[in-house]
Regions:
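Generic signature of intrinsically disordered, low-complexity, basic-rich segments
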Residues: 27-32, 115, 132, 136
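N-terminal intrinsically disordered, low-complexity, charged/polar
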Residues: 1-10, 22-24, 120, 126-141
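Winged-helix/helix-turn-helix nucleic-acid-interaction surface
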Residues: 65-132
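Small/flexible residues
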Residues: 6, 11, 40, 46, ...
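Short recognition helix of helix-turn-helix/winged-helix DNA-binding domains
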Residues: 1-66, 94
Length: 141
């Protein structure tokens, strides 16, 4: 007997792709939730989506200001780009619309993340080298 309460799992309709590499970037949990929601609502052909901070916030259970903070984090990490849109009302006035989000290829974000880590390690190595030279100079005096 077929159970009528369970639907078949169609991978095209009931799931969305989330790259495994996103977990290597050290994103905060809130930024990961916002990024996941944007991946969920994106148009798979243009990699773009429209959503207000309020819409995203209600989907991931955050306030609009918190969503704004995490969107800024995602932009800084190079995972998304945002573009302001405008709408024209029926009476001809121009108003701000919701943001247009473009999800960028994750490879660029990963490369940027590792370049930042390497730059930080280079700076630490340089500081260590300077510290050792300073100690050697102080011992020589």
């Amino acid at each position: 007997m077929k159970n009528k309460y369970f639907t078949s799992r169609d991978p095209i309709k009931n799931y969305f792709p989330l790259p495994n590499e996103v977990f290597d970037l050290g994103l905060s949990p809130g930024a990961l939730a916002v990024y996941s929601y944007l991946m969920y609502i994106e148009d798979r052909t243009t990699y773009q989506c429209h959503a207000s901070y309020r819409t995203i916030g209600s989907a991931v259970n955050m306030s609009p200001n918190t969503v704004r903070k995490y969107v800024t984090e995602l932009v800084e990490r190079g995972l998304i780009q945002t573009e302001r849109t405008t709408i024209i009302t029926q009476d001809g006035r121009k108003q701000n619309g919701s943001l247009l989000y473009t999800l960028l290829p994750i490879q660029f974000s990963i490369q940027q993340f590792y370049e930042q880590k390497l730059a930080k390690l280079d700076a630490e190595c340089e500081q260590e080298r300077i510290r050792k030279r300073l100690e050697a100079f102080q011992l020589a005096q």
